[in-house]
């Protein structure tokens, strides 16, 4: 069997998850609603810059446990096939981890394809994630996180 790797229609069917999940907007709306509630009710540092380029921000949700020293760090990179969604849609993932003693970092990045003046591709996003992890390594202790346990 040969896969139709160069058939644009086949590629569109395989990589267009929105078409495969007709009620995807219900999920997006629930994520956004639940995430807004999380940001309103648990301690967090929002829109912290890890760089100067478009999309280079992150949200930090410190551990709910305040004793026992530095805590492990969970870094969450949101999905969206590199072209949609935002870190603010995914704050809902933080509470179970912060309650279990983790510091949670939800990272944003520029979305493909960008603009004509500032194009974005997947290698660009990979470099942004390297930059974000560097920020976490150097700065997370200020939020109670333990850099060796990212």
Regions found by a protein language model. Name each.
Residues 85-93, 105-148:
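Catalytic nucleophile-loop/oxyanion-hole region of alpha/beta-hydrolase
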Residues 3-5, 10-69:
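N-terminal cap/lid segment of alpha/beta-hydrolase-fold proteins
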Residues 64, 81, 111-113:
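Feature marks short, surface-exposed loop/turn motifs that line or immediately flank catalytic pockets
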Residues 73, 147-150:
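Residue-level recognition of the N-termini of beta-strands and the immediately preceding loop/turn
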Residues 73, 98-110:
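A fold-wide structural signal in alpha/beta-hydrolase
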Residues 66-68, 95-99:
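Short glycine/proline-enriched loop/turn "hinge" motifs that connect secondary-structure elements
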Residues 69-80:
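Short beta-strand element of the alpha/beta-hydrolase
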């Amino acid at each position: 069997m040969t896969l139709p790797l160069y058939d644009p229609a086949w590629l569109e069917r395989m990589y267009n998850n929105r078409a495969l999940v007709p009620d995807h907007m219900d999920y997006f709306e629930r994520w956004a609603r639940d995430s807004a509630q999380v940001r309103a009710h648990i301690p967090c540092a929002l829109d912290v810059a890890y760089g100067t380029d478009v999309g280079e921000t992150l949200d930090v949700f410190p551990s709910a446990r305040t004793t026992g020293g530095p805590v492990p760090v969970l870094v969450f990179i949101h999905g969206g096939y590199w072209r949609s969604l935002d870190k603010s849609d995914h704050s809902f993932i933080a509470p179970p981890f912060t309650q279990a003693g983790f510091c949670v970092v939800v990272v944003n990045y520029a979305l493909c394809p960008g603009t004509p003046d500032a194009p974005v591709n997947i290698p660009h996003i990979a470099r942004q994630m390297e930059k974000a992890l560097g920020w976490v390594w150097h700065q997370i202790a200020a939020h109670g996180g333990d850099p060796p346990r990212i």
